[in-house]
């Protein structure tokens, strides 16, 4: 998958490059991950109600009807058209204040969207000069594309910030607080409702990463290899051009498909798509093609939208977040807990021994560590065959390909109730 790296985006916006800030005492860069309680007392609702801890549309008090134009109607002759009149309800969080100024934020959500429904997630940052910026749309999402084309939203940039695919970046001023808003939509006249069960966000400031890596391992002599099923993205080259043509463009859905299948095999619960669901795919490993279509961002024209991949995994019955880790030391507890991680990386000039020569943006699965922690065991979908997918990468080289490229972005996918290490709440 080709997507702009953090360094490219920050430079293009005229912001400080990673590592260009004055040297600081060695400490991890600040980040904050938060899961929002949908029943929080400081949140507000309009046209929505809580049922079993999840958010649905209420029976009355809905907003609308409002018109929506699906700019991707009948995309590639698929016959789908989300245009029409919609009723809606909203949930708005209270203010989340942070102990640091952040310059990027990624939200993620878990939702069910029956036919004719979809959800929109927005963020409103408060900048360090005290003023509140506008609401930025982070995604318009439905699990199916049969009657709505899920999409990121371009052209939102202003003096305060911009959204690149799925990530809010601030400009001249960092943000010190933010609010999230989720809007649930259904076609006017329908009784169907989306169900939002989880909403989270990770905010960070990556202008100085000194102290984050290289990291010291916590491994104590016994290696861990979770044995995630290996899928190659390359065997799908040329498949379904309307979903970005397979091959190098499908690293994210291939990685997501690997982890979903891992949980299917580990828990003996069928999270993966069934043969009936992927009957339209005439190729080997059809679950990869199915996933690529199910995460495809019709505005971005790609399958690498981070929250869309997490939302897809959640739509299969799992719990999923997009978050950030400072280094592999923080990844090790997840591996020991049996939880593989999908990581966003980039490198050039053969800087990762055993990997492809270079990539502007790539996703792969962290599935283990050697006993001394010097090697990270990875399922790298950028391999010619499934059998060649497992790789052993140097720890320090991997961190250098991961942290500067994405700030340690991972998809954290696991079953409901699975024992999960604590995520970084605040490290400033």
Locate the predicted segments by residue.
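Tryptophan-centered motif/residue detector
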Residues: 10-11, 109, 132-135, 229, ...
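Histidine-centered active-site/metal-ligand motif
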Residues: 117, 251, 362
């Amino acid at each position: 998958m080709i997507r702009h790296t953090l360094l490219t985006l920050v430079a293009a916006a005229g912001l400080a490059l990673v590592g260009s800030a004055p040297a600081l005492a060695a400490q991890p860069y600040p980040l904050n991950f938060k899961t929002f309680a949908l029943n929080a007392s400081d949140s507000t609702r309009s046209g929505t109600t809580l049922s079993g801890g999840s958010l649905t549309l209420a029976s009355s008090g809905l907003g609308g009807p409002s018109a929506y134009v699906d700019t991707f109607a009948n995309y590639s002759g698929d016959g789908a058209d989300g245009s029409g009149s919609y009723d809606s309800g909203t949930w708005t969080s209270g203010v989340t204040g942070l102990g640091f100024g952040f310059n990027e934020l990624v939200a993620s959500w878990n939702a069910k969207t029956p036919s004719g429904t979809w959800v929109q997630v927005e963020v409103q940052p408060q900048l360090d000069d005290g003023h509140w910026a506008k609401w930025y749309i982070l995604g318009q999402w439905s699990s199916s594309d049969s009657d709505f084309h899920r999409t990121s939203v371009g052209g939102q940039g202003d003096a305060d910030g911009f959204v690149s695919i799925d990530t809010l970046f601030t400009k001249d001023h960092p943000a010190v607080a933010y609010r999230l808003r989720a809007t649930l939509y259904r076609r006017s006249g329908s009784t169907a409702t989306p169900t939002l069960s989880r909403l989270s966000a990770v905010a960070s400031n990556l202008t100085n990463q000194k102290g984050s890596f290289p990291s010291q391992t916590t491994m104590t002599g016994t290696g861990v290899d979770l044995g995630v099923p290996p899928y190659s993205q390359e065997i799908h080259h040329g498949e379904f051009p309307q979903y970005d043509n397979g091959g190098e463009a499908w690293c994210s859905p291939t990685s997501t498909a690997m982890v979903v299948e891992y949980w299917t095999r580990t828990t003996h619960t069928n999270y993966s798509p069934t043969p009936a669901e992927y009957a339209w795919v005439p190729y080997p490993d059809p679950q990869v093609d199915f996933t690529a279509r199910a995460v495809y961002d019709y505005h971005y024209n790609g399958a690498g939208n981070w929250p869309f991949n997490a939302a897809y995994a959640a739509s299969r019955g799992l719990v999923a977040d997009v978050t950030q880790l400072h280094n592999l030391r923080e990844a090790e507890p997840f591996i020991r807990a049996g939880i593989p991680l999908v990581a966003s990386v980039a490198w050039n000039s053969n800087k990762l021994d055993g990997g492809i020569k270079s990539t502007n943006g790539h996703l792969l699965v962290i599935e283990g560590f050697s006993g001394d922690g010097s090697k990270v065991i990875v399922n790298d979908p950028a391999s010619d065959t499934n059998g060649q997918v497992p790789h052993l990468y140097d720890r320090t080289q991997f961190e250098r390909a991961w942290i500067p490229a994405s700030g340690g972005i991972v998809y954290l996918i696991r079953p409901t109730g699975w024992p999960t290490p604590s995520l970084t709440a605040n490290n400033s």
